[in-house]
Amino acid sequence: MTQTNGFDALHAHAQRLRGAAIPALLAAEPERPTQYAWQVGPLYFNFARQKYDRAALDALFAIARERDLAGAFQRLFRGEQVNVTEQRAALHTALRGDLTDAPVASEAYATAAEVRQRMGALIQQLEATDVTDIVSVGIGGSDLGPRLVADALRPVSGARLRVHFVSNVDGAAMQRTLATLDPARTAGILISKTFGTQETLLNGSILHAWLGGSERLYAVSANPERAAKAFDIAPGRVLPMWDWVGGRYSLWSAVGFPIALAIGFERFEQLLEGAAQFDAHALNTPLEENVAVLHGLTAVWNRNLLGSATHAVMTYDQRLALLPAYLQQLVMESLGKRVKLDGSAVDSDTVSVWWGGAGTDVQHSFFQALHQGTSVVPADFIGTVHNDDPYAENHVALMANVLAQTEALANGQDSSDPHRSYPGGRPSTVILLDALTPQALGALISMYEHSVYVQSVMWGINAFDQFGVELGKQLASQLLPALKGESADVADPVTRELLSKLRG
């Protein structure tokens, strides 16, 4: 990005604005509170407290045009091989809508719709049995997305099926889950793109034995033959996924099977509809009015021009408490890259460390550092305008904290006592859902997916591979024999010492 024609001008704006007070920016642009705000379907965004002005934004958009961002969106949606290292398309958008005339994308959409019909039929069959509980086994993209959506949208009471998620290879996770369930009234779903994932295979074996066989086991995999063979699952209970959908983008596919079981098939389809509606915004809206583009460019601005190494996400709706963990994978696995598409080194920093939690709990943990620490941490504050729980006063108090915290972080407060002085200048974006509906959550997740893609295009990196996760898995596999007491050649001296401790 630093090699683009417009970077010097952008850098000059950063030098000008780095020390600017956010109240001064608001005073200089009196219409800023509304001009930097957007309503896209059920989502409202306000960027007024970010540390840029119109001139800086124009410079950002100029670089986005130089990077052919609009063309990059076309290539993504049309099913071109945007995942260049693995020579694949990244057609997660086709799982929820058909927005182009590209045959590849249209075929993917039709294929996904057929599988969704199969999934709906399996759900009807399950609901007609005496099964009351589902154990979903997966990890990473096979777990975080489904777990987030199921937790956010599950009914407070009256659910026909209860869905439990197990991801960690630590046996305690499976033990605690199964201890509360009756094997005679439980079914299991094993989700793995390759069905070679150690955690899923080990946990799947435990679940298979606990259930007494495969009669109530289902699987989702891009390798359905291996899935069926590994646990003797009938082919009719194995749903496919595809190599043109990355794990962290897969909740819209049959990976969403546990979502549909938890919230109902109709509401699962509404989730997809909400995502497709935001997809249309991302694909068809001019850059300057495109919220996904603005969100992604804001992240680039804060990372590369203002030097922020971390980004916080605060969800002021308890039902979205798992969103920060989901976004950690979506953002950091997609953007944690050090080489460009052609294999050359990047010319700027890439991903920030993403983290966060649920408000107001986080105000009593890490907000001290946000307000008075030496690091400036940009943040997203996410809340809901309307809440359907019966405790209206609580919701009012919750939203009062969103307003108060974003104002305090931005404006600060002087004091003669340095211990009680707040420097301010902490930028934030406020995102409000009209209500936490399937459509709104689908749109929100879609927005973050496209924001990630924007950042990858600006940095010239591949958002759709994840080779960085492989080395540790390979070493773990090699060390298993040594941990079991078998002879093994372990070269690393620290690892040898740790092995001796673990083996006693």
Swiss-Prot record:
Pathway field: Carbohydrate biosynthesis; gluconeogenesis; Carbohydrate degradation; glycolysis; D-glyceraldehyde 3-phosphate and glycerone phosphate from D-glucose: step 2/4
Coiled-coil segments on the chain, per record: none
GO terms, biological process: gluconeogenesis; glucose 6-phosphate metabolic process; glycolytic process
Stored InterPro entries: G6P_Isomerase (IPR001672), G6P_Isomerase_C (IPR023096), Phosphoglucose_isomerase_CS (IPR018189), SIS_dom_sf (IPR046348), SIS_PGI_1 (IPR035476), SIS_PGI_2 (IPR035482)
Keywords from the named record: Cytoplasm, Gluconeogenesis, Glycolysis, Isomerase
Matches recorded under Pfam families: PGI
GO CC term (a single one): cytosol
Top EC class, one word: isomerase
Source taxon at top rank: Bacteria
One annotated GO molecular function: glucose-6-phosphate isomerase activity
Keyword Protein biosynthesis: no
Keyword Cell membrane: no
Documented EC number(s): 5.3.1.9
Primary localization: cytoplasm
Active site feature: 333 (proton donor), 364, 473
Reactions that this protein is recorded to catalyse: alpha-D-glucose 6-phosphate = beta-D-fructose 6-phosphate
Cell compartment(s), UniProt: Cytoplasm
Function description: Catalyzes the reversible isomerization of glucose-6-phosphate to fructose-6-phosphate.
PANTHER family: GLUCOSE-6-PHOSPHATE ISOMERASE
Family: Belongs to the GPI family.
Official protein name in the record: Glucose-6-phosphate isomerase
Species of origin: Xanthomonas oryzae pv. oryzae (strain KACC10331 / KXO85)
